[in-house]
Amino acid sequence: FIAQDFKTKKIITILNNRRQTTIRNYFFKYSKEARNRVKVVTVDMSGSYIPIIKILFPKAKIVLDHFHIVQHISRALSKTRIQIMKQFVKKSLEYRALKYYWKLIQKDSRKLSLNTFYSRTFRETITPRECLSKIFKLVPELKAYYDLYQLLLFHLQEKNAKYFFNLIQDE
């Protein structure tokens, strides 16, 4: 467990484990007034920290760590791709495209290369965008999930919280 100053990024302490009793015992060394001055606590997506944080820092906002949000939505797309992939015969073009080009499907679309490469799956020289286009023609149901994933990534990285949460609530 690492406690760090949000503004300065200075490490306050590194506890030897993540158990609630260890965390509670450490922070109860600080006065209630000092703990009430804490404004923000950033956590991973483990729900186990939230109850203890509310007790230790009653006035603090609890913020989910950016990395873990990206990891969570990335895993969701990956699981969806695998579920769709399993509907096809292993030797089919759809299965091979979904299996072989998983990294392209997961990649931030703004970071796709413009360079061409030879695709053994499609047996032609194409760009990553063209490859994705071919995959979505083969497996149109993946396109909606991909588009949502890309929108969530974009709004999260651009810190457009309003749009990010609207997308989550709409879907």
PLM-predicted stretches and their roles:
Residues 56-60, 77-82:
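Short secondary-structure boundary/capping segments
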Residues 1-3:
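Gly/Thr-rich phosphate-binding beta-strand-loop-beta motif of the actin/hexokinase/Hsp70
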